């Protein structure tokens, strides 16, 4: 989509060139989704639309699903941090890195240490005042920030799996040991040096991620979203004869006599 000056960000154009993109359309919003889904006199309709957008884009993607494929319905950004014994300054900074996205961005802190939680809260208040998007962060933190005090790691990750966050930071000693406890999260960041903005820009995995709890049943965008496959079956006569009667039993149990008949006529061969 173009900026307020009507131009496409040159950094996006450069990235598209490096990626080998052949066509670029300077359009955004719900109207851009409609254009791609249904086509125009100058634009051919596409098979699939992917990527995040505002609430209007999200609703437009929902409406055109079925005419085209989509990746997901993305909502406001969210980050969840499970931490104990970490630097509260670092944790606060990571939480604010998502709060600055949107007044409705959600930030969660899960910890077994109440004093640590208070230090993180104080750090967030201090750091917000020094950053340029203060009003956005303030709205996010006031309305959508939650802290959970847990008795142990198992309870921490039980809460994580209920939230199913878009981004999950695990800043505990030996963080890899907790991976088997994590079932629902879009992207998982392990260790104190794996700050969430690394995933936004440089880490490698695609950062279009399921939000609003949909990580419980959805995965990040990946190359598999741009491919599809077909199943292929082939029986010879011997294989058919071994299984024909069983197929007929299933078909008749469902009352689908034409299915059974398609098997029976071959039994006579």
Tell where the protein language model's regions lie, with residue ranges.
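C-terminal core of ALDH-fold dehydrogenases
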Residues: 161-269
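Conserved NAD(P)+-binding/catalytic subdomain of aldehyde/semialdehyde dehydrogenases
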Residues: 15-106
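Structural motif
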Residues: 22-25, 46-50, 54-55, 71, ...
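Short acidic loop-to-helix transition motifs that present clustered carboxylates
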Residues: 4-8, 27-35, 175
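A conserved active-site cap/scaffold subdomain adjacent to cofactor or substrate pockets
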Residues: 72-143, 147
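Active-site-proximal loop->helix
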Residues: 4-19
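Residues at or immediately preceding the N-termini of alpha-helices
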Residues: 88, 114, 152-155, 175-176, ...
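Glycine-rich, Lys/Arg-enriched anion-binding loops that position phosphate/diphosphate groups
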Residues: 128-169, 173-174
């Amino acid at each position: 989509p173009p900026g307020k000056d009507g131009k496409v960000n040159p950094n996006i154009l450069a990235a598209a060139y490096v990626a080998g993109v052949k066509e670029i359309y300077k359009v955004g919003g719900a109207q851009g989704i409609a254009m791609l889904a249904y086509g125009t006199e100058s634009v051919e309709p596409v098979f699939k639309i992917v990527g995040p957008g505002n609430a209007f884009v999200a609703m437009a993607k929902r409406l055109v699903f079925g005419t085209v494929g989509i990746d997901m319905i993305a909502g406001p950004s969210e980050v969840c941090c499970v931490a104990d014994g970490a630097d509260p300054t670092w944790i606060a900074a990571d939480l604010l890195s998502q709060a600055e996205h949107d007044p409705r961005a959600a930030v969660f802190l899960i910890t077994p240490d109440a004093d640590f939680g208070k230090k993180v809260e104080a750090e967030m208040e201090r750091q917000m005042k020094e950053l340029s998007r203060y009003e956005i962060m303030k709205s996010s933190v006031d309305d959508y920030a939650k802290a959970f005090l847990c008795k142990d790691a198992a309870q921490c990750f039980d809460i994580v799996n209920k939230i199913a966050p878009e981004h999950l930071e695990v800043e505990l000693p030996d963080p890899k040991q907790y991976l088997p406890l994590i079932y629902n999260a879009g992207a998982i960041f392990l260790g104190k040096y794996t700050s969430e903005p690394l995933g936004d820009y440089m880490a490698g995995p695609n950062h279009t991620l399921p939000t609003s709890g949909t990580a419980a049943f959805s995965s990040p965008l990946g190359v598999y979203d741009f491919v599809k496959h077909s199943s292929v079956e082939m029986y010879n006569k011997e294989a058919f004869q071994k299984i024909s009667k069983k197929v007929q039993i299933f078909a008749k149990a469902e009352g689908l006599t034409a299915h059974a008949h398609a098997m029976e006529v071959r039994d006579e061969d």
